[in-house]
Amino acid sequence: MEKELSLELCNAIAEAIIAKKELHGGSIDAYAKSLGISASIFSRLKKGERTNLIKPDKWLAIGRKLGVQIGTTTWRPVETDVYLEMQDDFSYCQQNAKALLLVDDCGIGKTYCARILIAKMHNAFYVDASQAKSKRLFIQALAREVGISTNATLAETLEDLRYYINALGGCFICIDEAGDLDYQAFLELKALINGTIGRCGWYMMGADGLRAKIQSGIKHRKVGYREIFDRFAARFRSITPDTKEERQAFYKKLFTDVAYQNLDDKNQLNAVIAKCYTKIDGQKTIPTDRSLRYLETLIKVAQQQNSNQ
């Protein structure tokens, strides 16, 4: 039996669909395809139709893609230092058709910030490479994101994709978890960048695995890695500081900024942040894995305990 969604949720997702079109410079058909619906369904949504128009699973998939919140979640997005740095990076890349490479710690909110920023940008697209590791899957994922049909051959889809990006102009494409791309996918990414010079900004994000993959490829003179590193300014950009003292200050501010905006009881602030620290040899140090995810869990537990009192 198919699940039923509330009219309230469908309305929220439909409103997000209509609003996002204003930021998509392509045709209605291309925009609709990027969401997995037809242009006629988009038109009917604009006219107010909801019932039996889209299957529940598709509603949910679109809602997730567009960042529509489900239920009564009170989690508040925060413009952290990570958010502000990435905002500057994204703007620079899009306005100047340049490419940058961000390699940083896990759990500082890179993906979360990227999704929020891209949702606000014109002609900006996001691909999670961990879900599209191979050459075929990567090209198809990017094609679907920008609104290109994937029914043609892979070579034709790639040509259509390159043509469409150039035709739109001023595009921005963020490749998250880029270290998961296999070798052939990396080569196609390089070809796409070469074929859209001056027409599209690119941004690759990942953690240590991405750095290791590129460095290893360059060291062993594997075709393409030196070229793609050069396209991305020949530099591994990082937001998290290198020195111990600066890192601790960075993480403390990151935790505090997020916790302050999301904790209702500010008296719990210091206690919650303190739990994000681990002790090694009797000294406090900050974990570098799942930091903000752990903080989010602590905050939600604290909120639940308060509501039960």
Task: Report residues per predicted region.
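C-terminal alpha-helical "lid" subdomain
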Residues: 1-30, 34-68, 235, 240-309
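Short C-terminal boundary/hinge segments that cap the last helix of small helical domains
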Residues: 67-81
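Walker A/P-loop nucleotide-binding motif
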Residues: 95-116, 130-131
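Conserved catalytic segments around the Walker B and adjacent sensor/switch elements
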Residues: 121-131
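A short helix-turn-beta junction within AAA+ P-loop NTPase domains corresponding to the substrate/partner-engaging
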Residues: 122-124, 217-240
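Mid-core helix/loop region of P-loop NTP-binding domains shared across ATPases and GTPases
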Residues: 134-135, 140, 149-190, 194-201, ...
